[in-house]
Structure formats: C-alpha cells, structure tokens
Amino acid sequence: MKLSRRSFMKANAVAAAAAAAGLSVPGVARAVVGQQEAIKWDKAPCRFCGTGCGVLVGTQQGRVVACQGDPDAPVNRGLNCIKGYFLPKIMYGKDRLTQPLLRMKNGKYDKEGEFTPITWDQAFDVMEEKFKTALKEKGPESIGMFGSGQWTIWEGYAASKLFKAGFRSNNIDPNARHCMASAVVGFMRTFGMDEPMGCYDDIEQADAFVLWGANMAEMHPILWSRITNRRLSNQNVTVAVLSTYQHRSFELADNGIIFTPQSDLVILNYIANYIIQNNAINQDFFSKHVNLRKGATDIGYGLRPTHPLEKAAKNPGSDASEPMSFEDYKAFVAEYTLEKTAEMTGVPKDQLEQLAQLYADPNKKVISYWTMGFNQHTRGVWANNLVYNLHLLTGKISQPGCGPFSLTGQPSACGTAREVGTFAHRLPADMVVTNEKHRDICEKKWNIPSGTIPAKIGLHAVAQDRALKDGKLNVYWTMCTNNMQAGPNINEERMPGWRDPRNFIIVSDPYPTVSALAADLILPTAMWVEKEGAYGNAERRTQFWRQQVQAPGEAKSDLWQLVQFSRRFKTEEVWPEDLLAKKPELRGKTLYEVLYATPEVSKFPVSELAEDQLNDESRELGFYLQKGLFEEYAWFGRGHGHDLAPFDDYHKARGLRWPVVNGKETQWRYSEGNDPYVKAGEGYKFYGKPDGKAVIFALPFEPAAEAPDEEYDLWLSTGRVLEHWHTGSMTRRVPELHRAFPEAVLFIHPLDAKARDLRRGDKVKVVSRRGEVISIVETRGRNRPPQGLVYMPFFDAAQLVNKLTLDATDPLSKETDFKKCAVKLEKV
C-alpha cells in the first residue's frame, strides 16, 4: 500500500495511541488509515456507558469499519476507553440474528418447540393473537414490556405511548430500574426534579473527589482520566474512595476506605454530625434554601408480602416524612459519633475524620460521585438523600467544582428511561401517572380520550418477574436488555415465569442472549448506527446521530417494531366504549394512526433528510418519524426546566445540556447566573419544590436484607469489569475484549481461600439460598476483597451469578440490591 506523508503520520498516531491504551491496532483500522478517501466519517455517541463519549464512525461499503475518539467531543476530547476502540466489532458477531425465530413444532407455535425462522408478518400474527387474547380475557394488566436505558429517546417515547396510551397498561419498565431508580427517587425527594445539577466541567475545578460505591477507573474510565489528570497536576487536590472491596480506583486514592456492607449509611450520618459539631454549616445558604424532614423508618425490603422481613416491617414501602427542627436533626445525627461509626463500619477513625474534613472545609470544593454501590442498595434512596445532606449543609452545590453527582451506567438511562418516563410510574419531564393533572396534560397533547392513561402504577421490574411466575402477567415483550442474565434471583423468580406455558415471551435483540434463548419469539434487532438515534448522558447532555449503515438481513430497529406492530390494533379492540364515546372520531382507527401517524408527528417530510441519508423507518413511512416524535416529546419539558433544543440543533452540535433556553445550554442548575430559571437576586432556587427549597432528610442506619451467618458465611457483591459491558452480549463478541477477560472469576481474599483449602485457579461452587454456580478462584488481580467478602462480575453467560442474588429491593425505588447477599463456597 502506498501511503502519503499525511497517511503515514496518521498511521503512526493510531499506533501510538493504541500502544498508550494497551491495545493492538485492529487490522481493519490499520488498513483504514491509508484509505481515508474511501471512508465516510460521521459522529455518534458511544454505544456503551452513561459517560456519553463522542466517537467518529468510519463506514465503507455498507459496514462500520473503524471508530475513533471525536476530538471535538467535549466529554472525551478524542479519547476512547478500551471498549470504545472496538465499537465496530460489536455489530458483526458470527451469531448476529437476521430473521425472526419462533418456537415451533409440527409447523405451529409450541412452548417446547425449536426456534424456527419465520417472516415478520408471521411474527406479528402470533404476537397480535397473544396480545389480543390477553387483553380480552384479563385486561391491560396482563401484558407488559421491559425496556432499556439503551433505547434511543424516540424508541422509549414510542414504547411508552404504545403501552400507556394505546394498550392502557402502565406495565412498562426499563432495565434502568436495576441501576438508576434509587437516584431518581433520591433526586425527586430532595430537589423535586430528577438528574444532577452539575456537569463534567466540575472536574477541572474541584479540590476533592469522593467516590461512594463507584469504581470509575473501570466503569467510567474517560471521566477517571480527567480526574486523574486533575489530581496529578495539582498537589492540593484530594481523592477519597469508599467501597466494600479494593479496586482499581484505589490506586489514585489519598484516602481509600473499605467499609462493612450497608454501613455507608452510618458514615454519611457521621459526616453530617461532624459538620454540625465543627460549626461548618454554611448558615446563609442553609437558612435560605433548605428544609428539614424526618423520614419514615423500618420500611421493609421490597420482597414478596409473605416474606418474614416484610411481615415484620412496621412501615413497609413508606415514603412518608414530617418536618423537624434543626435541634432535632442535630440530636438525630449526634448519635453517629466517631467511635460508634468506626465500630459499625470497620473503618479506622483517622480515615473517617479525614473524609469528614473534606466536606467541612469551607475552602474545599468537593464533588461526590456514586453509581451502583449506592443505588443497588436496599436503602439506596436514603443513601442518595444522605449524600445530598452533606452538600446542602455546606452549600457545596450548584457551583463550578462542587456538588453531588450520580453517574449513570447506560448510554440513555437519563435521556430515555428517566426523561422520557419509561418507568411504570412516570410520564415525560418528571410527570407521574398518579397525578391527574399530569395524565390530563399527556392525554390532551396526544389527542386521546380523557381517562385513557391508567392512574395505577404499573409493575416494576422485579414485580414483573413475580407476576409472570404467578400467572398474572401473560404476554411480555423485552427490548434492548438481557434481564434473564442481568436480573436477580433467576431460579426462583424469573425462569419459572418465562417458561410457564400460560405466558408468551418476546425478546427483541441483535444476538441470541440468555434472555432470547429463554423466550418464545426472538425478533432480530438493528443496533447503534444501523438506525437514527439519540441518547441522553449523565450530565444532561442530549446527543444525536444519523443512521450510517443498514442492519443485516431482516433485522429492524426497536422503533420500527413498535410502530409497525401498532398497526395491528384498532381503538375499539383496546379501549372501552366509554372512552371511545369521548372521542368518536378515533373509532375505527389503528393505534398507528392515533399514536404515530398523527398531524403532530407526521408533519415533518422525508425531504428534510439529505437525498443520500439513510433512515429506513422514515423512508418506509413517508414522514420524518424521529423528528416528529422528538418534537412532540420535547414539548412536555419546554418552559418547565427540562427544555430541549430544536431537533435540528442536535445534529449540528456535539450534544447540549438541558435546560437549553434561547439556544444556550445549562452547566449548573439551580444557581443564579448559571440557570435561566433562577432570577436575579434569588441566589439559589430549587424550583422542583413549591417553595424553592431543597430537603435535608434524617434517615438512620438499617441492616441489609441478608447477611452472612454460620452456614452462608461470606458476603457476595456483584458488578462489572473494564473489558465487558453488563452481560457481555456485545463485548464478548469482540475477540480482543474476550481474550482480555474470557470468563468470570470469583475474587476472594487469600486467607478466606486458604481457610477453605482453595488455591488460585481452582474451580469452586458458590452457593446461596437460591442457587449455585461454578466459578474460578482468583486471589490476586485488580479486585481485592477484604476477608469475609467475595466479588464476582456478571458478564459471563456460562456463570449466571444472578442465580445467587436476592430479589430484595429498595422499597421506595424498587431497585434491586445486587451488592449484598450471603453465600458459602464448596471446592469442586
């Protein structure tokens, strides 16, 4: 190959960057460097985590052949993590699904049959029959959908409309229930609005970083690179890391803290006590912008009502609270002394004091980061509320360089699951189904009869499993998620319902995942840049991308599937007569006509697309579907502090952080001069609350739902590793990533292994009260648990660690605690 000087320099740059990242350059990328003229490049956000890195996607001859960090992307500034560099390969696994597959025997659907290729029409025929039968015989509560924080914004919006408005069922929930629900409820309780007030620009201005249950070095490596740069370039910057086991983020920590599982609640209250005792309250901020409330306690563990722990709870599921005085709050946290905290947590006193001093020092700008260690917690909402307390006591919030920041794990857990409102209780822009006014706003905008959207909260993720097992939920469609592997308590609460002959399970996915193979019908699905999309990341940044290639075979996007399936239903088949009587003009129309092909949605012509621009859905339907859905959805938040920019602006920009008012994005919410909703002279205004004040909650320590005992003598914590993402359904199909971490292992303290006659590399049976798996002993490596705790990642389909986990949830958020259950080990 003959290279120009420019191409030669680019080739060297690629090789150098790859070497610095510890990578070999994929052969296809090597070839690409010298063939720039043949490659078409376009922008997109990364397909993986909630950081929202920008990438440049290289396509050639209808395939994605290369990917590089986008130097113009403000999030990552041209840098990718190891997963981002291999994005092209996630799309071309050898087992990519290209046609619908139905379990059949003797030419007909059979629950025990073999997967057999069928057409899309045949697939929709079977689905139509199953949905209509369930709706007719048992009503809207017998059908459900499990969606995703990986849906595009308009896919989530279309799904929510179809179920909540079309089928009149709120039984739709996203997999973000398993990762971000506690953050959502925490934000709503404290501030009255969801999502962080700060942004990534805080990193370069902060004096201290505190990680609560967040291994950012592996789970948010690009943000970690920015924190590392800040720490190493300024000797006065401090990093504290709190976890139940030692991981890679500890390598940068000035104060690395290992605490007993569940006792983070104790540490949080101790710091609040320290702030008060040392007169470190920002009195001006506190007196003007904060209310105090005492929350209900002994609220249970989100288990089945028949479980002994639920029967014993005095206030199961209670979100109640009552006003309290400062003196009462001071007395409440005073119980969390240094001595008591050290005893309950196992953390040395000097480390606790160092941590508390960071928050108490008025000259230190502090950012608190957290992810699943806080959220996947039976008191996850409380943990979120308690960390907000520290920032509200000190006034370290809504200003550059300081604030509490909940990091998301999925690319659009914020933009789709939360902002669109695909949770069983939510509607767009923080509205909820239980509020009559909110339902009325949606019904009027959607031009459907008053009373169409049910007021009853639908089934959340874990409740869906239980309802399937109990035969109450009979038709279940999952999209863009692998919950059979990712959800808790597989043996007792999920697999029985999926394989129950009363139930029909549909899985839409690009690959034959554990979930797909447990289903009755598999729908082949387009992924990432095989469709036009939009994600919303952790810092409220909404990012768009164009369709850049076509999906293989007959694979179709989730949006196409939802919209085309809606054609199978007429209003009189899904709505009662009293609703139809309110809008007789809708009688005889299909849900496609009522929900999607409306004047509001269909008013943008396909001619707005460039002549050579791919957009399979819009060109098939004859109007710009994505733009119509987005503009209708964006209407709900404009003028209400959730303002999104016009559709076309996002295709021009590298994302914009809402609220976007008069073309300007917002970096810091709730503070004067930064937020357009805070007027001059107000200073701060937490306008999600009627009085503009945030809430400090008094909430105590309460124990975990399950803890080690004489028989099951170890804590088990589960999570991720750098090389793989969630269940590995994409990353394990990338040879380089698979080789880097080919199978899950059980990380264990060497002394715990020795006490059980186990050595590194031994096979071991990990047993809980719910199931067992075989894994490999690892006494070294990146994760170093303390004695009494073992850690196991969940990416490996051959080691389904969620056979072990308990389906205990936070009673307020309904989010599962994947970090704490009890296990024992048996040598194999």
UniProtKB/Swiss-Prot annotation:
<dbReference type="InterPro" id="IPR006657">
    <property type="entry name" value="MoPterin_dinucl-bd_dom"/>
</dbReference>
<keyword id="KW-0574">Periplasm</keyword>
<feature type="binding site">
    <location>
        <position position="81"/>
    </location>
    <ligand>
        <name>[4Fe-4S] cluster</name>
    </ligand>
</feature>
<feature type="binding site">
    <location>
        <begin position="243"/>
        <end position="247"/>
    </location>
    <ligand>
        <name>Mo-bis(molybdopterin guanine dinucleotide)</name>
    </ligand>
</feature>
<feature type="domain" description="4Fe-4S Mo/W bis-MGD-type">
    <location>
        <begin position="39"/>
        <end position="95"/>
    </location>
</feature>
<dbReference type="InterPro" id="IPR041957">
    <property type="entry name" value="CT_Nitrate-R-NapA-like"/>
</dbReference>
<dbReference type="GO" id="GO:0016020">
    <property type="term" value="C:membrane"/>
</dbReference>
<dbReference type="GO" id="GO:0030288">
    <property type="term" value="C:outer membrane-bounded periplasmic space"/>
</dbReference>
<dbReference type="InterPro" id="IPR027467">
    <property type="entry name" value="MopterinOxRdtase_cofactor_BS"/>
</dbReference>
<dbReference type="GO" id="GO:0009055">
    <property type="term" value="F:electron transfer activity"/>
</dbReference>
<feature type="binding site">
    <location>
        <position position="531"/>
    </location>
    <ligand>
        <name>Mo-bis(molybdopterin guanine dinucleotide)</name>
    </ligand>
</feature>
<feature type="binding site">
    <location>
        <begin position="508"/>
        <end position="509"/>
    </location>
    <ligand>
        <name>Mo-bis(molybdopterin guanine dinucleotide)</name>
    </ligand>
</feature>
<feature type="binding site">
    <location>
        <begin position="212"/>
        <end position="219"/>
    </location>
    <ligand>
        <name>Mo-bis(molybdopterin guanine dinucleotide)</name>
    </ligand>
</feature>
<dbReference type="GO" id="GO:0043546">
    <property type="term" value="F:molybdopterin cofactor binding"/>
</dbReference>
<feature type="binding site">
    <location>
        <begin position="262"/>
        <end position="264"/>
    </location>
    <ligand>
        <name>Mo-bis(molybdopterin guanine dinucleotide)</name>
    </ligand>
</feature>
<keyword id="KW-0004">4Fe-4S</keyword>
<dbReference type="Pfam" id="PF01568">
    <property type="entry name" value="Molydop_binding"/>
</dbReference>
<dbReference type="GO" id="GO:0050140">
    <property type="term" value="F:nitrate reductase (cytochrome) activity"/>
</dbReference>
<comment type="subunit">
    <text>Component of the periplasmic nitrate reductase NapAB complex composed of NapA and NapB. Before export to the periplasm, the NapA twin-arginine signal sequence interacts with NapD and NapF.</text>
</comment>
<feature type="binding site">
    <location>
        <position position="819"/>
    </location>
    <ligand>
        <name>Mo-bis(molybdopterin guanine dinucleotide)</name>
    </ligand>
</feature>
<keyword id="KW-0479">Metal-binding</keyword>
<dbReference type="GO" id="GO:0051539">
    <property type="term" value="F:4 iron, 4 sulfur cluster binding"/>
</dbReference>
<dbReference type="InterPro" id="IPR009010">
    <property type="entry name" value="Asp_de-COase-like_dom_sf"/>
</dbReference>
<dbReference type="InterPro" id="IPR050123">
    <property type="entry name" value="Prok_molybdopt-oxidoreductase"/>
</dbReference>
<dbReference type="InterPro" id="IPR006963">
    <property type="entry name" value="Mopterin_OxRdtase_4Fe-4S_dom"/>
</dbReference>
<dbReference type="Pfam" id="PF04879">
    <property type="entry name" value="Molybdop_Fe4S4"/>
</dbReference>
<dbReference type="GO" id="GO:0008940">
    <property type="term" value="F:nitrate reductase activity"/>
</dbReference>
<feature type="binding site">
    <location>
        <position position="376"/>
    </location>
    <ligand>
        <name>Mo-bis(molybdopterin guanine dinucleotide)</name>
    </ligand>
</feature>
<dbReference type="InterPro" id="IPR010051">
    <property type="entry name" value="Periplasm_NO3_reductase_lsu"/>
</dbReference>
<dbReference type="GO" id="GO:0042128">
    <property type="term" value="P:nitrate assimilation"/>
</dbReference>
<feature type="binding site">
    <location>
        <position position="558"/>
    </location>
    <ligand>
        <name>Mo-bis(molybdopterin guanine dinucleotide)</name>
    </ligand>
</feature>
<feature type="binding site">
    <location>
        <position position="802"/>
    </location>
    <ligand>
        <name>Mo-bis(molybdopterin guanine dinucleotide)</name>
    </ligand>
</feature>
<feature type="binding site">
    <location>
        <begin position="718"/>
        <end position="727"/>
    </location>
    <ligand>
        <name>Mo-bis(molybdopterin guanine dinucleotide)</name>
    </ligand>
</feature>
<dbReference type="InterPro" id="IPR006311">
    <property type="entry name" value="TAT_signal"/>
</dbReference>
<feature type="binding site">
    <location>
        <position position="53"/>
    </location>
    <ligand>
        <name>[4Fe-4S] cluster</name>
    </ligand>
</feature>
<dbReference type="GO" id="GO:0009061">
    <property type="term" value="P:anaerobic respiration"/>
</dbReference>
<feature type="binding site">
    <location>
        <position position="179"/>
    </location>
    <ligand>
        <name>Mo-bis(molybdopterin guanine dinucleotide)</name>
    </ligand>
</feature>
<keyword id="KW-0408">Iron</keyword>
<comment type="function">
    <text>Catalytic subunit of the periplasmic nitrate reductase complex NapAB. Receives electrons from NapB and catalyzes the reduction of nitrate to nitrite.</text>
</comment>
<dbReference type="GO" id="GO:0006777">
    <property type="term" value="P:Mo-molybdopterin cofactor biosynthetic process"/>
</dbReference>
<dbReference type="Pfam" id="PF00384">
    <property type="entry name" value="Molybdopterin"/>
</dbReference>
<feature type="binding site">
    <location>
        <position position="372"/>
    </location>
    <ligand>
        <name>Mo-bis(molybdopterin guanine dinucleotide)</name>
    </ligand>
</feature>
